[in-house]
Amino acid sequence: MPEKIRQQVPSEDQLYDLAELFKVFGDSTRIWILYRLFSGEYGVNELAESLNLTQSAVSHQLKLLKQARLVRARREGKSMIYALADDHVSTMIGQGLEHIAE
């Protein structure tokens, strides 16, 4: 474990926030959406079609992912375009995949 992490004692609020973040990863549909966003920005309809899900289901999951700050959105005309919030998201998923492969 890195020394920096060992020296820091997380507050109760930080532990709660971390638990809430990990809850978001507890749904395979959300993982699929994040994984799809690895390759770029997409609108809700594009994501729904590529994942064989309804637009409503994808919108609901994107709302949760946005609240968790894992995705960001921007308006393009009448549509919202979604992308990963930052590189941390792909790093977390990649490390999770490495962990389960061990």
PLM features: residue spans?
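N-terminal helix-turn-helix DNA-binding core of bacterial DNA-binding proteins
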Residues: D13-S56, R69, E76, M80-D87
